Regions:
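Residue-level signature of mid-helix packing/kink "hotspots" within the transmembrane helices
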Residues: 29, 58-66, 150-151
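Extracytoplasmic
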Residues: 12-44, 235-240
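Extracellular/periplasmic helix-loop-helix junction of adjacent transmembrane segments
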Residues: 35-63
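Juxtamembrane intracellular "pre-TM" segments in multi-pass secondary transporters
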Residues: 1-7, 191-222
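Helix-breaking motifs and short loop linkers at transmembrane-helix boundaries and internal kinks
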Residues: 44, 76, 97-103, 114, ...
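Conserved MFS/SLC helix-loop-helix module at the cytosolic interface between two early adjacent transmembrane helices
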Residues: 62-102
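Helix-loop-helix hairpin linking two adjacent transmembrane segments in secondary transporters
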Residues: 103, 130-133, 140-188, 192
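Cytoplasmic helix-loop-helix junction between adjacent transmembrane helices
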Residues: 107-148
């Protein structure tokens, strides 16, 4: 009989969750200094088109956010994270070896779709393990660590560009993805037991969206959040050129 893994300590859990959540931020913010170099390397005629390197990640992430919650409820938290990390890493490889801008954007879409798993499933992991005020405290600690990544990522990307080209930034993020996946596999036990899982159907996603949109409070918050997030994406995509 296979012995269950022991729960990891709070401090290690905080840093593991923060690392997994930071994959999206790294794949976006670390690439900002490299947009001009990417455009030149891939013969992008209009400099404004390089902004799609950023927006493609958000587009892919939008689709993934709808899928990984129900998947993790059916197949377990860790399996869903493995799937997302795998897609994320494949997207990075496509971007690294892309010879034209279309392949670059395809890779970026996959990176966004894959990294969405960490944004969704890490929250489910936290809810599985903690509740009440302790859950709020852990979320605060994880976000406090995570929030440092978007602030540091552009400097990391620029530092890499001083010694290598834009592909080295992708290799750096790829290495962190591998490290995060191995850390998750070795140290973090599965938090959703088999008896608490439910069958996956696309009707679950549809009914969830329908229920959210029917609720006026949820609908209002979603619209407001969308407007704010849209402005943020617009700024982030054009920040490097500005």
């Amino acid at each position: 009989m296979k012995q269950a893994k022991k729960e990891i300590g709070h401090r290690e859990f905080v840093f593991l969750m923060a690392l997994l959540m930071s994959m999206t931020a790294l794949s976006i913010d670390a690439m900002l200094p490299a947009l001009g170099q990417i455009g030149q390397s891939l013969n992008v005629q209009n400099p404004n088109d390089t902004q799609m390197v950023i927006s493609a990640v958000f587009l892919g992430m939008a689709g993934g956010l709808l899928l990984y919650g129900p998947l993790s409820d059916s197949y377990g938290r860790k399996n869903s994270l493995y799937l997302g990390i795998g897609i994320f890493l494949v997207g990075i490889i496509i971007s690294i070896y892309s010879t034209n801008f279309s392949f670059m954007l395809m890779g970026r879409l996959l990176q966004g779709f894959g990294s969405a798993s960490a944004r969704v499933v890490t929250v489910a992991l936290i809810r599985d393990r903690f509740e009440g005020s302790e859950m709020g405290r852990m979320m605060s600690l994880i976000l406090a660590v995570f929030i440092m990544v978007p602030a540091m990522a552009p400097s990391i990307g620029q530092g890499i560009l001083y010694v290598a080209d834009w592909r080295a930034i992708f290799w750096f993020i790829f290495a962190l993805g591998i490290f995060g996946g191995l850390w998750l596999n070795i140290r973090q036990p599965e938090t959703l037991t088999a008896e608490n899982r439910r069958s996956f159907t696309f009707s679950i996603i549809y009914s969830g969206i329908k229920e959210t949109l029917k609720n006026p409070i949820s609908r209002t918050y979603a619209i407001i959040s969308g407007i704010i997030f849209g402005a943020f994406i617009g700024y982030l995509s054009s920040a490097q050129q500005i």
